[in-house]
Design a protein with these regions (language model features):
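C-terminal amphipathic alpha-helical interaction region
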Residues: 7-17, 24-28, 32-34, 60-131
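N-terminal alpha-helical targeting/anchoring segments
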Residues: 34-36, 40-54, 63-68
Length: 131
């Protein structure tokens, strides 16, 4: 693996190209303009996921471990973390259903709220999650 350019540097270069060079060429072509903007946005999501995704996944795993009383150490690979978070989210879902937990159970609600906020930070950072 090389030091520079990083994968996020490359993605940001493509985004820059789309906005500064490609999009102006499509000013009279609505569909191509739209697809260019969507592509630019998707690259932004990928870039933010590369930069922050694993850290946010680690936070979610730590919160889930506490809620589900799991004794664990973080798996070494990103794929293993993703699989584990999916399994534990199913366990949490089942626990909430079985125990009929509600919004009054603030530890569970806070976890869900924090997880959603973190996901929105990746997919749509301009969305205001402050209440």
């Amino acid at each position: 693996m090389q030091d520079k350019p990083t994968s996020t540097d490359l993605i940001e270069s493509i985004q820059d190209f789309l906005m500064k060079e490609a999009l102006p060429q499509f000013k009279d072509k609505d569909l191509l303009s739209y697809k260019t903007l969507v592509s630019w946005n998707m690259l932004g999501v990928v870039s933010r996921e590369i930069r922050s995704g694993e850290e946010l996944l680690d936070r979610e795993l730590n919160r889930l471990a506490k809620l589900l009383n799991k004794d664990f150490s973080l798996p070494p690979s990103l794929d293993e973390k993703k699989k584990l978070v999916n399994v534990w989210n199913v366990e949490l879902r089942d626990k909430i259903r079985k125990e009929k937990l509600s919004l009054e159970d603030s530890t569970y609600w806070n976890h869900v709220k924090e997880t959603v906020i973190e996901k929105v930070e990746i997919t749509n950072p301009r969305f205001n999650t402050e209440s």
